[in-house]
Amino acid sequence: MMFEHVLFLSVYLFSIGIYGLITSRNMVRALICLELILNSINLNLVTFSDLFDSRQLKGDIFAIFVIALAAAEAAIGLSILSSIHRNRKSTRINQSNFLNN
């Protein structure tokens, strides 16, 4: 019974992240939605790892790897966003045309 609740929560978080990523106009909000998507994927990895083979920690270890990857992605993304904000004075997606100077 708990398995279905966790999967429903994961699908709900993934849907919120996809919706926010599609409708977001701010780059910081899009980055946060991307983190939400990665966290819902981690929830699925840990749930299925516990369901199918609780003695081996393959899903848990892979989830830790995804957390490290998400932290690196957030650090790089925020540094790029701070550079864009410093140069363009805006973090809106529709105003960030890098082809024109």
UniProtKB/Swiss-Prot annotation:
Listed InterPro entries: NADH_UbQ_OxRdtase_chain4L/K, NUOK/Mnh_C1-like
Subcellular location: Plastid, Chloroplast thylakoid membrane
Top-level EC class as recorded in UniProt: translocase
The reaction(s) this protein catalyses: a plastoquinone + NADH + (n+1) H(+)(in) = a plastoquinol + NAD(+) + n H(+)(out); a plastoquinone + NADPH + (n+1) H(+)(in) = a plastoquinol + NADP(+) + n H(+)(out)
Transmembrane segments: 2-22, 32-52, 61-81
GO BP, sorted A to Z: ATP synthesis coupled electron transport; photosynthesis, light reaction
Annotated Gene Ontology cellular component terms: chloroplast thylakoid membrane; NADH dehydrogenase complex; plastid
Cysteine disulfide partners in this protein: none
Record membrane topology: Multi-pass membrane protein
Keyword NADP appears in the UniProt entry: yes
Protein purpose: NDH shuttles electrons from NAD(P)H:plastoquinone, via FMN and iron-sulfur (Fe-S) centers, to quinones in the photosynthetic chain and possibly in a chloroplast respiratory chain. The immediate electron acceptor for the enzyme in this species is believed to be plastoquinone. Couples the redox reaction to proton translocation, and thus conserves the redox energy in a proton gradient.
Known partners and oligomeric status: NDH is composed of at least 16 different subunits, 5 of which are encoded in the nucleus.
Protein name: NAD(P)H-quinone oxidoreductase subunit 4L, chloroplastic
Species of origin: Oryza sativa subsp. japonica (Rice)
Gene that this polypeptide is encoded by: ndhE
